[in-house]
Amino acid sequence: MRQTARFVLRKTLLISFFLLFTGFLSAQAFPDRFIGHWKGKLNIYQGPKLAQTISVALEVFPADSGRYDWVITYGDSGKDIRRYMLIPVDTAKGHWAIDEKDGIVLDIFVTGKKFTSTFAVMGSAVQVCYWIEGEELLMEIWSFNEKPDHKSGLGTEEVPEVNVYKFSGYHFARMQKAVK
């Protein structure tokens, strides 16, 4: 019985160490795996239908002091360019910030394999998520009304009140590394 308990304890410690170590490696892989010039297509959905597809590019390159240039280009003309800066805040906890260089700074977090920011602007709440699958960089943007569309539930301890939000849009991009 004591040997079984020791075995279980060792196995638990080994699994815990493995999970901690893989989390550490995942944190170390970011943003290094994102470095480069990525190009692809951004699908913009309105309701269930694909409304528009445009070109999108993301450039991520080391700048200084642990910061990175984070440059997003929308469309083929190359006129809609967003020159942002990725800034480390508390990288051990996966906390970064995107400085839009106009007074807007958005928190963004590494959670698992995804890099996610949630914010509200002009009445819309927006969630942006980046991650890498295989050799592709994927991006999702979800948007919904900032104010609840309606409420549900009873407002009791057993059945709390729940705010329900009207969904307004979804964008999805699939990008591959490219030579600029």
Protein language model features and the residues they cover:
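Bacterial Sec-dependent N-terminal signal peptides
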Residues: 1-30
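Beta-sheet ligand-binding and adhesion/scaffold domains
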Residues: 95-180
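N-terminal helix-cap/turn-to-beta initiation motif at the start of protein domains
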Residues: 25-39, 51, 62-63, 87-88, ...
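Short, solvent-exposed loop/hinge segments that bridge or flank secondary-structure elements
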Residues: 29, 39-69, 154-156, 162-180
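A short hydrophobic beta-strand element
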Residues: 36-40, 68, 137-141
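Central antiparallel beta-sheet cores of small beta-barrel/beta-sandwich binding domains
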Residues: 42-127
